[in-house]
């Protein structure tokens, strides 16, 4: 638990309620709750929704770090087109149908994403 809180940057907030945290910290808290049981798959529905650009980037860097550190596979559902540049496999869905399905050969680190 301590390692997870440290990884997520929540150590100093360990005794706070989520309502006492900023939007980005609340998002990290939600990620911590999802990771506490060491899942092999993490489903992320709009992980950057309602966050400003800097906090969005911080959350994506965090997800990238979790993937590398714990080997957690992630399925990210988003309307944020920039995120497709950091992922391995991209599926684009329109009107309930997959319109594109490809492997991203030119992945960009989350820290280098533009237009978040």
At which residue positions do the language-model features occur?
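Helix N-cap at the start of a conserved alpha-helix in ABC-type nucleotide-binding domains
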Residues: 53-55
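Conserved catalytic loops of ABC-family nucleotide-binding domains
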Residues: 65-76, 84
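A short, proline-enriched helix->beta-strand linker immediately N-terminal to the Walker B motif
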Residues: 36-40
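ABC nucleotide-binding domain "signature" region
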Residues: 1-8
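Catalytic Walker B motif of ABC-type/P-loop ATPase nucleotide-binding domains
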Residues: 42-45
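Conserved ABC ATPase signature
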Residues: 17-21, 25-27
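Hydrophobic anchor residue at the start of the ABC signature
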Residues: 31
């Amino acid at each position: 638990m301590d390692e997870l809180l440290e990884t997520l940057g929540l150590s100093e907030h360990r005794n706070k309620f989520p309502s006492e945290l900023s939007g980005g910290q609340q998002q990290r808290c939600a990620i911590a709750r999802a990771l506490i049981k060491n899942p092999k798959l993490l489903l992320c529905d709009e992980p950057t929704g309602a966050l400003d650009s800097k906090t969005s980037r911080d959350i994506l860097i965090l997800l990238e770090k979790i993937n590398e550190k714990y080997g957690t596979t992630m399925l990210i559902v988003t309307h944020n087109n920039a995120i497709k540049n950091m992922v391995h496999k991209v599926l684009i869905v329109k009107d309930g149908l997959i319109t594109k399905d490809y492997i991203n050969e030119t992945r960009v680190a989350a820290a280098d994403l533009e237009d978040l």
